[in-house]
């Protein structure tokens, strides 16, 4: 369970993670684009940031040859964390936008509202 970031802070609607995972910067950007295209207006907050570097070695490298180069960046997402928030649009529009964004993440998510009700 997450230590913080489990409640909506900025928007009226949000997308909550239901499992633990590493989310890459490409997945976050893909979800952002999907939401931006479907919203048409309103405000979007991305509540996670890819601040952890994942390093790799080439195939020809031997063991014990150092740390390796940064391959990509990930955000560590814990169960219960709010991933994205939206405000300034009707609930139907926000729900559809979050549904499109949920496909981009490697974890199950749930659409939530500020009223504390779990929507669909």
Please describe what each predicted stretch is.
Residues 1-120:
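Ribosome-associated RNA-binding proteins
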């Amino acid at each position: 369970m997450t230590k913080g970031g489990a409640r909506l802070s900025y928007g009226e609607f949000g997308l909550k993670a239901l499992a633990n995972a590493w989310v890459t910067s490409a997945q976050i950007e893909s979800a952002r684009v999907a939401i931006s295209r479907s919203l048409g207006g309103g405000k979007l907050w991305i509540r996670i940031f890819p601040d952890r570097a994942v390093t790799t070695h080439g195939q020809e490298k031997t063991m014990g040859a150092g740390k390796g180069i940064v391959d990509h960046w990930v955000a560590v997402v814990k169960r219960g964390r709010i991933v994205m928030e939206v405000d300034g649009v009707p609930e139907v529009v926000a729900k559809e936008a979050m549904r499109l964004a949920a496909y981009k993440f490697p974890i199950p998510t749930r659409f939530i509202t500020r009223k504390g009700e779990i929507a669909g």
